[in-house]
A protein has these predicted regions:
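Auxiliary, metal-adjacent structural segments of Zn-dependent hydrolase domains
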Residues: 30-133
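Metalloprotease/metallohydrolase-associated module, dominated by Zn2+-dependent proteases
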Residues: 174-247
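Boundary at the C-terminal end of the N-terminal hydrophobic targeting segment
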Residues: 14-18
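Soluble non-cytosolic domains of exported or imported proteins
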Residues: 86-97, 143-148, 152, 187, ...
Length: 299
């Protein structure tokens, strides 16, 4: 009996080991530099006194950064604050434009609470939260070389825009418990702080970029966090610009009186969510609005 119990404990221990150390590293092509961005424009706003966090100091600093107002196609706006150490407004603007575009590749749901961006030199980790995204350009070079700059922004923006809304929600906590495992060591070590951000990128990959990851990777994600995946599905997050906002046109509408079955088909986008807008007047059945997750290009 003791031998059996010991074996059982060993098996459980192996099952509980997370499949990844950190999820920003699982695949560099989940978001590509060529993917669409909601970035629209950048307007100079001079310089002004601001309080910024600098990881090189491990503290808050008061500076007079170069200021830029980034505007996005979904109506969101961000003030980009560039450390004056970059020397002049032109060089600061280059940094602001560079990262404003990449941030625009994030979905509306991830940018909705981002009010400011801090840009410093230095090889220090990025950060999210405080209605902000923190960038150290030396570290950005490393992320770019590894192909994970965009994936890192997804992680950090999840902290900024999703943590406060969901990390302490009873349904999220219930999903964690139901899964019984963590997607990464980082999530396991800091379940309250990092689990949501660590889980969201893999979720995004299987739902919206399934063609860019291996089947084995997708299987591993689905097996490890199935209930967290269901939780994210339930949120109906605004996925623009990954998913276009225009409702697709119905290309077939057929009613079988014999079967009392109404069949509707439309050209869908893989990963998009749809519901049918119900009406007793068939003349208004012209478009499909967003809940059913599309698995093929024809739904």
């Amino acid at each position: 009996m003791k031998v059996f119990l010991l074996s059982l404990l060993c098996i459980c221990s192996l099952r509980a080991e997370p499949p990844f150390w950190g999820t920003i590293f699982i695949d560099p092509d989940i978001i590509k530099p060529s993917d669409p961005s909601a970035y629209l424009s950048l307007k100079d706003a001079g310089q002004g006194r601001r309080t910024m966090y600098d990881r090189r100091e491990n503290n808050w600093v008061i500076l007079t950064p170069y200021l830029f107002n980034a505007t996005y196609k979904d109506g969101l706006k961000i003030e980009v604050q560039v450390n004056p150490e970059f020397g002049n407004a032109d060089d600061a603007r280059k940094e602001a434009e560079k990262y404003s575009y990449v941030i625009g590749q994030l979905t509306t749901a991830l940018r909705r609470d981002v009010e400011t961006v801090w840009i410093h030199k230095g090889t220090n980790p990025f950060g999210g939260g405080n209605n902000n995204l923190l960038i150290h350009t030396g570290q950005a070079v490393k992320y770019i070389n590894d192909g994970i700059l965009e994936e890192t922004f997804v992680h950090e923006a999840t902290h900024t825009s999703l943590d406060s809304r969901h990390a302490k929600k009873p349904k999220w906590i219930a999903a964690q418990k139901a899964d019984g495992e963590f997607i990464s060591n980082y999530a396991k070590d800091y379940p309250n702080r990092e689990d949501l951000a660590e889980s969201y990128l893999p979720y995004f990959a299987i739902r919206y970029r399934p063609d860019r990851i291996s089947k084995s990777l997708a299987k591993k994600i689905k097996q490890t966090i199935p209930n967290r995946i269901k939780y994210f599905d339930s949120l109906a997050l605004d996925m623009y610009p990954v998913i276009k906002r225009e409702a697709p046109s119905v290309n077939q509408l057929f009613y079988s009186e014999e079967k009392q079955l109404l069949t509707i088909s439309w050209n869908s986008q893989v990963g998009a969510k749809y519901i049918i807008q119900s009406s007793s007047d068939f003349s208004v059945w012209k478009t499909v609005m967003t809940y059913i997750i599309a698995d093929t290009i024809l739904t």
